[in-house]
Amino acid sequence: MKQLYWYTCGEGDCDLVLLHGWGLNSGVWHCIIDRLAPHFRLHLVDLPGYGRSQDYGAMSLADMAERVAQQAPKQALWLGWSMGGLVASQIALSQPECVRGLITVSSSPCFTARDEWPGIKPEVLAGFQHQLSDDFHRTVERFLALQTLGTESSRQDARLLKSVVLQHQMPDVEVLTGGLEILRTADLRTALSGFTLPFMRVYGHLDSLVPRKVASLLDSAWPQTQSVVMQGAAHAPFISHPNDFAKLILNFAEENKK
């Protein structure tokens, strides 16, 4: 079996697995490692087809979750950002023995706008999929720029995201298209409605990809979960507000100690 890139560090006794979003790799977490490493055993994963896990083609959400779970510690906290939030959520649903708590960041159980549900317009995602084959690098750059739009440090944060992408070979177009297909089609709203493990959802107030209205809708639909909307943050709050973000994670872990 081909191994995913899986880097473990930290001095704590609580396992925390971090899953990156579309187009990126585990390098995106380096800005908060120093803040979390004293408290956790961190597991930084390159999802199949991304970063240093290049030996994979496009995968479905279920297959990606199954593959990641195969290398995972038991009873870990899982933190998934954006598309990584879908992967972490799918693992929590299908491999609950791996999970003691779930944190999703700037993520949605359904990224696509539907009747009375806010999200990305289907034609926008379809447009990104089409543009990948025409102008691969520019399409990825446009998507990264959307993630930091509106924050005080928008340009600086976008440059950081771009540098993370360029650290390693770019994912294949097939992998990126498959990731957009996951964002376009996945809908875990019903499946997660009965989820009973500790679950925190973190949002950016200025996020243009996951509207903050998602937070209030899920507060009503999933009253057993908790949500935090970070003021001044967009789609990557751990980059624009690393100290506040790290405190949220530490508090969640402390409140849900076993």
Curated annotation (Swiss-Prot):
Coiled coil: none annotated. Pathway: Cofactor biosynthesis; biotin biosynthesis. Its main location: cytoplasm. It is an enzyme of class 3 (hydrolase). Residues 16-242 form the AB hydrolase-1 domain. It comes from the Bacteria. Keywords: Biotin biosynthesis, Cytoplasm, Hydrolase, Serine esterase. SUPFAM superfamilies: alpha/beta-Hydrolases. Signal peptide: none annotated. GO terms for molecular function: pimelyl-[acyl-carrier protein] methyl ester esterase activity. One of its GO terms (cellular component) is cytoplasm. Its EC number is 3.1.1.85. It holds the Pfam family Abhydrolase_1. It catalyses: 6-carboxyhexanoyl-[ACP] methyl ester + H2O = 6-carboxyhexanoyl-[ACP] + methanol + H(+). GO terms for biological process: biotin biosynthetic process. Monomer. Belongs to the AB hydrolase superfamily. Carboxylesterase BioH family. The physiological role of BioH is to remove the methyl group introduced by BioC when the pimeloyl moiety is complete. It allows to synthesize pimeloyl-ACP via the fatty acid synthetic pathway through the hydrolysis of the ester bonds of pimeloyl-ACP esters. This is Pimeloyl-[acyl-carrier protein] methyl ester esterase. It comes from Yersinia pseudotuberculosis serotype IB (strain PB1/+). The lineage of its organism: Bacteria, Pseudomonadati, Pseudomonadota, Gammaproteobacteria, Enterobacterales.
